[in-house]
Structure formats: structure tokens, C-alpha cells
């Protein structure tokens, strides 16, 4: 089992409940999409799984370990096995892309190697290979502030590929990309995860991409799991309920009297 959550709640300091009674299991190597309206708790769930936030109640197990039962040092070693892809990657503007990618293994390297690599990138070939998979091989020595939002997101994905993470948690990893590039990038991420046996959980606003690229889809609404289904079983009724009064918009009937059709915006 790659991850397991039993009865997980998350209540913020202001009393707002972000997650309620989350029960979830992902086997090693599974690839799962997480969808739901804005504010549903998708990012909160990913932060709990990354052991960035401690749940208010319930049990969390990641890669065979209970993170909050570990010492701080052991928890840091666990985090080094987890790859995070951010919607807006936290990359220093003046940092070179090669250093941003190599940072994926800083938690796995000895301290001396990590420090040296920050000054003089030690594995340029490895960084280039990861970037080349995302058509960014020519950006190896560019500064991060010279890249577009979509390019920065792909650098973040390249860093996780270089890291060889056992568990990949991706929060809106393609939100800054056009539809075609987003599809290509998700297909690549899925192929790489499958080839390496990595577990992949990605939150997405674009429902069409979730259904197209992931075998299993989880719908989250108001901090609770609304459904957990194979992609082929996610029907219109499930999506209508998930996005009720949130993102679904009905087209007016055509002059010929055709019924209204419900559309889910990509973002």
C-alpha cells in the first residue's frame, strides 16, 4: 500500500474545516486524478499527504510509515521519497534551471554533495535528460525568471522525474499550459510513473484531462469524498452532483428546441 488515510479531518486555526472523515487507499503504482470545485479541499488533502500539514484527527500512512509517529529526521527522509509538483513551482527567480531540477535529489544526497551541487551542478547530464523528456533540453542554463508559467510547471515535473520519487503528488500541474501541451504533459507523467512503478495522485480542474489520462478518479466536495470510481464509470450524474452550483453552466436551448447541455469548464 502506497498511502492510506483513515478518518482524516483537517481543521484550520480559524475553525474552518478543510477535510472531513477522509478514507482513502492507493496501492503502489496506482495513478489517480483528484477533481472537484474550487475550495473543495484538494490542495489541503495533498498537503496532508505530503506531511506538510498534520491532520486534526485520523491516521495517515505513507510508503509504509506513519509520518507523525516518526522523529523529525526520519520524517524528512520519508519526504525525500515523495515528489511534489506545485501549481506555481517555488523556484528562486535567479536560479538556473539545471539547479532547479537537481534540487529534486537534495534530500537523498549527503550534505557535502548537496552543497557542492548548489554552486556547481554535479549531474548536468541527468538534469538534461529529465528536461529533454519535457522538450526543455535547451533551457538547461536559463534562469527561472526567463521562463513562462507553463515552462516553469514542466521544470517542476522534470525535477520530480529526476528525483525518482516513489509517490508523486501533483497540485494542478498543467494549469498554465494550453490544452494540447497539457494533454501531452499528463500523458508523459503517466507513462513515466507507470514505467517506474511510482504512485501518482494529481489534482486537476480540467475534468476532461482527468477522465482521459487517469484510470481512477476521486471527486472531492466540501472536504469530503463524493465518489471514488474508475474513470469509465464517472457519469454525468456524478459530475452534476460534484459541481452543482459551482462550475456547471447550462446552454440555452437552441431555436429548434434542443435540450440544454451541461458543460464543465476546463478551469
Curated annotation (Swiss-Prot):
Report the residue ranges that make up the ABC transporter domain in this protein.
Answer: 3-247
Any single Gene Ontology cellular-component annotation: plasma membrane
Q: Which GO terms describe its molecular function?
A: ABC-type phosphonate transporter activity; ATP binding; ATP hydrolysis activity
SMART domains annotated for this entry? AAA (SM00382)
Q: Where in the cell is it found?
A: Cell inner membrane
Relate the protein's function as given in its record. Part of the ABC transporter complex PhnCDE involved in phosphonates import. Responsible for energy coupling to the transport system.
PROSITE patterns reported for this sequence: ABC_TRANSPORTER_1, ABC_TRANSPORTER_2, PHNC
Q: Which InterPro entries match?
A: AAA+_ATPase, ABC_transporter-like_ATP-bd, ABC_transporter-like_CS, MetN_ABC_transporter-like, P-loop_NTPase
Encoding gene, per UniProt annotation: phnC1
User: Family, per the entry?
Assistant: Belongs to the ABC transporter superfamily. Phosphonates importer (TC 3.A.1.9.1) family.
Keyword list (alphabetical) reads: ATP-binding, Cell inner membrane, Cell membrane, Membrane, Nucleotide-binding, Phosphonate transport, Translocase, Transport
Give the EC class as a word: translocase
Q: Which catalytic reaction applies to this protein?
A: phosphonate(out) + ATP + H2O = phosphonate(in) + ADP + phosphate + H(+)
Self-association state and partner proteins as the record states? The complex is composed of two ATP-binding proteins (PhnC), two transmembrane proteins (PhnE) and a solute-binding protein (PhnD).
One Pfam match, given by its short name, reads ABC_tran
What membrane topology is given? Peripheral membrane protein
Give the highest taxon in the source lineage: Bacteria
Q: EC annotation?
A: 7.3.2.2
Which residues hold ATP? Answer: 36-43
The molecule here is called Phosphonates import ATP-binding protein PhnC 1
Species of the source: Pseudomonas aeruginosa (strain ATCC 15692 / DSM 22644 / CIP 104116 / JCM 14847 / LMG 12228 / 1C / PRS 101 / PAO1)
